[in-house]
Structures are given as C-alpha cells and as structure tokens.
Amino acid sequence: MEKRKLVLTIIGVVILAMVIMVYIYFSKPGRDEKKNQQTINQVQTVQQKTDEKKENTEKNTSGDELENVTPGSEEYRGFLLDNVLHSPNEGDIHYNVYIPDAYDGTKEYALYVTLPGYQGLYFQGVGENIRTEDFGFEAQKYITDMIIVAPQLNDWGQTSADQTIELTQYFLTHYIINPSKVYINGYSGGGETLSLVLAKQPELYTAALMCSSQWDGAYEPVVETKTPVYFVIGESDEYYGSEPFKEAYQQIH
C-alpha cells in the first residue's frame, strides 16, 4: 500500500513538473514578438517584390507612354495584377503580366498571351483568369525568358479581339520581344476570341493553342499565313462538343 502511494506521488510530481516547464516555455518574453516580427518580415518581402515588378513595368514605359498605362499594385504568383492600357482606339484594356526578374531590356524575350474563359473575364474579379487557369504558369516551364500577358477581357467577341491585338502590339513596341517567338492561347470563350484575332492579324503570332472552344473567325487569313494552330478538346466536350474543332481543322489543314 505504501509502495503504491509512493509511486502515485512520484507520478504526480513528474506531471506537475511538466506543466510548469510547458508554462515557462510558452511564457518566455519575446517569443510572441519574434513570431510577429517574422510575419512582418514576410509581408514586407512580398510587398518589396510587388514594388519591384511594378517598377519593372514602369521603367519600360516612359513619358507619354507611361501616361497610357496604369500599373497594378497587387501580385499573385509572380504576376502583377490589373494593369490598364488606356488605348485611344480600344478603350481601357485590363491585363495581368509576368515579367521575369532578369528582364532588363538588353536581349529579346519571347511573348505569351493567354485569353481566359468566361470565368476569367474582368467582371468576375481581378486576377480570376490566372487564379482559375494554369496556362500562364505552365508556359513558364517551357521558356524561362518569356513575358506572359494575361488580359482580362469583357467578352469573347470582336471588341475583345481588337483589344487583344492592341495589347500584343503594345508589348511588341515597348518591350524587347523576339517577333519569331510570340505565342497565344485561348480557352473556352477565350478560344472564340482567339479565332477572331487570328482572322484579323495572324501574322502577329508564331503559333496558337485553342482549348475547349469553337472557331468563330474566318479561315482564309490563317491559311494564307500558315500560322500553326493546335486544337485540344474532349471528344464529348459538354459545352462545345468536338465537331466545331474537327471542322476548323479540316478548313485550316
């Protein structure tokens, strides 16, 4: 009996000691302050990177050119969000842009333009195109020296096609771009916009990728310029079906 009491007493002392040690550990002065400072440092680092990308966007547009562009202030996975090109002909064109940190204007870079589906249009929210589609991020895996532009258009019709062409020409004019490495893709409604873009100025683009969409534009300009167009769609796509792409392929091939 006495032995059992002794064992219970020892166990109680050990538990009490553990409780005291835990209390002392979590009550150390400066512990919370250190964690808070780490969080502040992380936030400041993200803000610094955003400011650097904004500065990189601004330094490539100066004077009258800068007056035509309003740089964004928020960053998402390396993209500077909601920049606005104020075009006298096509109105305000909202776009997100990824400019590699190494870009300094001393050598030519490739250009990739990605057109969103319905869920990524501008009225759906800033950055929704790159938050819901991975085309811009996948492109980075193929060519590291590449500027990626993700416009947030307002529809999938002629106005958006004209704005896409205007934005492409803006980057070709104001950035050091290799004209033989200009790529474009369109997903769903963005694919319809892409077909209208290619019907108007296919010579701007080296190659095009259309995913889960249909061809709304004319075929002849693409045939004449021999611009490569790649079609990707499920055989039983729930919205478009595969027949529109099969027809477009036959017309262009």
Predicted regions, residues:
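Primarily recognizes the serine-hydrolase "nucleophile elbow" in alpha/beta-hydrolase
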Residues: 173-174, 180-224
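Solvent-exposed loop/turn segments at secondary-structure junctions
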Residues: 117-121, 153-158, 188-192, 213-217, ...
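Loop/turn elements at helix/coil->beta-strand transitions in domains of secreted/extracellular proteins
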Residues: 107-111, 143-147, 178-182, 202-208, ...
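Short, solvent-exposed loop/turn and secondary-structure capping segments
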Residues: 108-109, 122-128, 161-162, 196-197, ...
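Active-site machinery of serine-nucleophile hydrolases
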Residues: 111, 115-165
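Gly/Ser-rich "nucleophile elbow"/oxyanion-hole loop immediately N-terminal to the catalytic nucleophile
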Residues: 102-103, 107, 156-188
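The feature captures the conserved acid-bearing segment of alpha/beta-hydrolase catalytic domains
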Residues: 206-253
